Curated annotation (Swiss-Prot):
Protein name: Structure-specific endonuclease subunit slx1
Cellular compartments annotated: Nucleus
Record text on subunit structure and interactions: Forms a heterodimer with slx4.
Gene3D superfamilies in alphabetical order: GIY-YIG endonuclease, Zinc/RING finger domain, C3HC4 (zinc finger)
Region (Disordered): 97-117, 321-340, 368-395
Function of the protein: Catalytic subunit of the slx1-slx4 structure-specific endonuclease that resolves DNA secondary structures generated during DNA repair and recombination. Has endonuclease activity towards branched DNA substrates, introducing single-strand cuts in duplex DNA close to junctions with ss-DNA.
InterPro entries found in the cross-reference section: GIY-YIG_endonuc, GIY-YIG_endonuc_sf, Slx1, SLX1_C, SLX1_endonuclease, Znf_RING/FYVE/PHD
Gene designation per UniProt: slx1
Similarity comment: family membership: Belongs to the SLX1 family.
Its EC number(s): 3.1.-.-
Length: 424
């Protein structure tokens, strides 16, 4: 099998999250997945639009709700790594044996450890552990809770947990209001977006940062690094700019990184390579490293995205956040097909490399299922070929065409592959 490589010339994605889905009919029915667009993904799980997953297609469990979501992943693969570890805390190598609280007591027919049945408490406790282990503790992540009872369960476990979360890890709540409508400043009734509807999944938050970069970096620029004071030549290095609009600080990427890390070492010991956040040498405001390098990645690798974003019409007042996910969905068929091919590349990448799933056809296929224990492997295997890209469509065993049509397709790469895979 040829080793496949993922392209490294893409900018940091505007949004990617790992979510915990819960049935509103039966709260013990849980599902873990990942997506770049939570609103679209939830609609798929609830059968409102094409897509979703076999497990969430059961009518007696719909509608589903997103109880919480972890966001801020720097790449799609990073989200998949975290998702797989969250789905499989009993075998993931990211959790050291001394910290593991989920253990496999049974084996599948293939001989691999069978995932223990999860509860809300086990998923939240393992989420807490993953956010404290070295693999993920310094990632620029955020946790958002949309269900009050789930947040209370999280707080209860956090008090009893031995490991502590990073102080700068944002934990945000956005619960449904007492009334779905609130009065605006003019006294008129208006809908206030909340929960996943309020998530900004486009690059709108980065737009002003990009506009600032467009003004600074040009062929006749005469600037110097704010840290080392060396002259900065156009297109001859990786230069970072502060996201604060009124700040004029420009630095080498390595200079800013070392500046942040030196400040961190004064507060804690360790030999970290990538900072989390730090104080801008210009405006002296705290800024997040991920915000800085996201603009840099777009400037260096996402020219088409930048041109479209800066050249797009302004969104009408009051609809910025609420429509960000609609903007993503209305980009056109051509871009949607391109995105689907990228998602399929992610699946192929893990199939061929990270998971070494050579015998995946004989294995229990990967849909994250915390529902009934008596689900057969055959039902899981139906969902194996769920790519929407016609170029990569494959035939599945002896199943009839009618049965295949009845299966809800997957998207957003929320599959887990359980072959010979003890991941990264």
């Amino acid at each position: 099998m040829l080793r496949q490589q993922m392209p490294i010339d893409r900018p940091i994605p505007s949004f990617y999250g790992c979510y915990l889905l819960r049935s509103t009919i039966r709260h013990s029915a849980l599902y873990v997945g990942s997506t770049p667009n939570p609103v679209r993904r939830l609609r798929q799980h609830n059968g409102l639009v094409k897509g979703g997953a076999v497990r969430t297609s059961r009518g007696n469990l719909r509608p589903w709700e997103m109880a919480c979501i972890v966001t801020g992943f720097p790449t799609s693969i990073a989200a998949l790594q975290f998702e797989w570890a969250w789905q499989n805390p009993h075998i993931t190598l990211h959790i050291p044996p001394s910290s593991r609280i989920s253990h496999a007591t049974q084996k599948k027919r293939s001989g691999h450890p069978k995932r223990p049945r999860h509860t809300l408490q086990s998923l939240l406790s393992n989420l807490h552990i993953l956010l404290t282990v070295p693999s993920f503790s310094r990632w620029p992540l955020e946790i958002k809770f949309f269900a009050p009872d789930v947040h209370r369960a999280w707080l209860k476990w956090s008090k009893a947990a031995t490991g502590s979360l990073r102080d700068t890890l944002p934990i945000i709540t956005d619960f449904p209001p007492a009334e779905s409508q609130v009065n605006d400043e003019d006294g008129e009734i208006t809908d206030r977006p909340y929960g996943i509807e309020a998530l900004n999944v486009a690059y709108e938050d980065t737009k002003s940062h990009l506009e600032k970069g467009e003004r600074i970096f040009h062929s006749e620029m005469k600037e110097s690094c704010n840290i080392c004071n060396q002259d900065l030549q156009h297109n001859s290095g990786l230069y970072t700019i502060c996201p604060n609009i009124n700040c004029h600080s420009i630095t080498h990427m390595t200079c800013l990184s070392q500046h942040f890390l030196r400040a961190e070492k004064n507060e804690q010991s360790g030999e970290e390579l990538i900072p989390v956040q730090g104080m801008c040498p210009g405006c002296r405001m705290d800024i997040r490293w991920n915000d800085v390098v996201k603009e840099l990645s777009l400037r260096m690798r996402g020219q088409k995205v930048v041109e479209k974003l800066l050249g797009a019409k302004r969104v009408k007042k009051g609809k910025g956040i609420a429509t960000s996910q609609e903007v993503v969905e209305s980009e056109g068929d051509e871009e949607e097909e391109e995105e689907e091919e990228k998602e399929q590349e992610l699946v192929d990448y893990f199939d061929a490399d990270e998971f070494h799933a050579r015998n995946v056809a004989q294995e229990e296929n990967g849909f994250v299922d915390y529902l009934d224990d008596d689900d057969s492997d055959a039902v899981s295997n139906i969902s194996m070929e769920s790519s929407k890209s016609p170029k990569r469509k494959r035939t599945i065993g002896p199943f009839s065409k009618a049965k295949l049509i009845a299966v809800i397709e997957d998207s957003d790469v929320d599959e887990e592959i359980e072959g010979e895979e003890l991941e990264r």
